[in-house]
């Protein structure tokens, strides 16, 4: 029974052939007209034996390929011969062709098979088993039917030779019939390949594709349309809502994809048409403005663009608030107005001539952002500045007047005083002329009244301050001025007292008690005002050698220590006390000191240093004259404290600050500066050098009085002599002693190299050597040398 599993029945898949048109095959019975050998039907074998013999026969005689016509003819002939005339095969086998030995041995087997399968008709087509399945089938059949095979073998051996010939012929005919059956069109091998490629699903019920109604034989009555509905999109089950139009009414570029349903589409057609109409309206109203080209001119003029009307900017809010169709039609009206406005030129660009004209009409402001920035009230800043300037002018009224009349007023200035400020110097018109600052009368301003009230409070304390100032003047003169000089200076002091007015009398009365206490205490002299030779003499007087003490600073420190050890600390305490009190009322003392310096210096003789025997006496007297110049006004201030000019005068409440000279920054002076210098020199009648701070450098005041006795013609002669002396100087040799007046370079070479000229050294060289080369017998001071340097743009400075 296992052999049945190796055979499969295949449902016919290929179309049936039309046998009426096929050619009938030529068989021996048809060719020779022989009757069939036996008419009696053979006995039917068992089904297991039938399939076993068919498998063995197929293994021995494989089918050979033939042409389609011959195969078709053979198939029809063999089928007829097998079914209708089974007896003819026996007779034909007797007269068969002589075959080989292999055909004779296999003839008896095939004959029996053909007889057994004569009347069997299969409803389907039998597929050929593979070689493996055939081997299994033969092994199973041999094990089960051994008895049948043995019986067959016994019968075969007992058969006679005539019977063997018949069997051979029958087997040959059967083999030909099988070959025709294989080529008949079953194509079993190809059918197996098709089946392996695709196997249809099991059909539970036959469904007619053409009809929509379900078949009667199926249990579940489903049509083909019902089956496809399971795969169809069902709108009822979907939870998506219909697409709502956007708030603006514009259809988006990306639209939702939906399956088309005819019923839903018909319902949506009027809605979509309405939305399209609304979208067209909104597109017309909401047309985007065209992008303009971004140019440099557009960027510059954008900040001056006129802002449009605000009504056009809020059109969108009105549309969103309106819900009816009437509201949507209203905003179209202002759009027409804006379209008309856009035609006008947005930017009005001026021509080059008009642009330059507008620039010329503008007022330029100079200064930093902090200076140009103002508070909420524009008058507050101006009133504050005016009040400060007024208070300074009241405090430094006399000081400012002397600074403007002095010859050196252009080089040294204070921080708070001066007629011209920094911005007034820089203000110029289009022609290059200096613009004079505006003068504003702020006397009625409340801020000025507050400042004046404060100044009145300060004036009440003036007697006390003046009494402290007088103590310093008395103590300074007692230590430095001899008695003979004091008596000689009294007439000059009286002249100054008469012109000073009522203020010096008040200070004189208040300074009485302090005069006696200060005169009793010895005061330490100011060694910083001594010259190098004077310092050396003082050091030698205390018994020190000059080799051990070198340098100006070391000598001053040594002299201070020696004086303190000799006189004690009481004098130093008095100096500190008087110096602190002198800082209160400096303005009166400074102005009086300048007048006394200029008037006393006219009466003093001069002496020069020793260079030649012929000039011995004038030079010796000049040294004494220098000392008397600084001491005589001090003696006058001992009796009249208004004209105080003590050597260590500290800074006042408004410190005098030495600024950097303009000659150091600009080697070649500007034309305006030269013009101002000429005007100041022409106006000058008594060129006093009194604007220097006397407390820091008293040596400057000692040497500055040289130019007080010179008029304009004398100044020009001395300046030409200075120029001649510089050109006549030869290169000096370096001395072994290391004196300060033996530089390696000449003064002319230093000037060419822009090296700062030390005024003290240059003046000393002119008085000792320079004027001798130029045949000049007079001497010059530091102030005149400084004026000469600044007029020629030479960098000069005082000794540090």
Swiss-Prot record:
Start-end of Polar residues biased regions: 16-27
One cellular-component annotation, GO: Slx1-Slx4 complex
Bias kind Low complexity: ranges: 67-81, 126-141
Keywords assigned by UniProt, alphabetized: DNA damage, DNA recombination, DNA repair, Nucleus, Phosphoprotein
Localization per record: Nucleus
Chain spans, region Disordered: 16-186, 235-255, 590-654
Biological processes per GO annotation: DNA recombination; DNA repair; DNA replication
Amino acid composition bias (Basic and acidic residues), ranges on this chain: 164-181
Family: Belongs to the SLX4 family.
Protein name: Structure-specific endonuclease subunit slx4
Protein's organism: Talaromyces stipitatus (strain ATCC 10500 / CBS 375.48 / QM 6759 / NRRL 1006) (Penicillium stipitatum)
